[in-house]
Amino acid sequence: MIKKALIFCSILWAANAMMWGQTATVKPLTIGEVRTFKSKTLHEDRTLNIYLPQGFDKTKSYPVIYLLDGSINEDFIHVSGLVQFFNEMYSMPETIVVGIANVDRKRDFTFHTDLKDLQKDFPTAGHSDKFIAFLEKELKPYIESQFKTTEKYIFGQSLGGLVTTEILLKKPEMFDNYFIISPSLWWDDESLLKQAGTLLSKSHDTKKFVYVSVGKGEHPVMVKDAEEWYDVLKKSNKKNWTVEYKMMEADNHATILHRSLYEGLVKKFPYQEPK
């Protein structure tokens, strides 16, 4: 009996030795590029996280998503995964994602306010005009010099949704598709929302896709403002604009982004049989 046990232990030891003796080849998992862009407008370096489709071909043209809050530890990884999934399972074409890493989102995503309490709570705020100029005059031309591009998208949530709304109202020609998630339209006593109808009346009726979403579990002011913003968009009667709205029943401000973008992309790109 003891002899059998010793034989079994010897076999087990030999098997373990073989297993631990095996080697594996290790190499980086690469989904794109990290670039440092020197902005003259913002007087600082900005990190760009760029997702390139599998089999990227520099001779081909691709849509581009400009993703706010696009740091590696923010939204870049999971949004790039959504884009890859929608290319595989839906009718979304292969798409480049440009994640714009934050330096100071309160500074970049808010416009000037004279409200003293906001100035106190957000001392660096109020410079979205410079950030928008950076996007328009520097970043977009740079990306278009590096890649052949087609449609342009912008994704923004919270304060990112505020500046995305500001761009749509003041410089709508900058992008073709606007995904506006939980926009912080409360900023500056809702002044942008109050101007929205007038600003929309001045914009051209060129083809656009606009998606607005908010979580049912968010602050009541966020919900009210998002619903009013959607109403203003619908009443603008832009015949060439597709305007979609989604109340995310199970989400709050912290949980909404991924599921909401999924729902927005479903509205933009219908399901197709897997390739």
Predicted regions and their residues:
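Alpha/beta-hydrolase fold nucleophile elbow
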Residues: 147-158, 178
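Conserved acidic catalytic loop of the alpha/beta-hydrolase fold
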Residues: 50, 133-150
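C-terminal catalytic histidine-bearing segment of alpha/beta-hydrolase fold enzymes
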Residues: 219-275
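Short glycine-enriched nucleophile-adjacent loop
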Residues: 161-172
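Active-site machinery of serine-nucleophile hydrolases
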Residues: 74-132
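Short beta-strand/loop motif that positions the catalytic acidic residue
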Residues: 212-214
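Mobile cap/lid helix-loop segments that gate and shape the active-site cleft of serine hydrolases
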Residues: 170-207
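A domain-start/cap signature at the N-terminus of enzymes
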Residues: 19-63
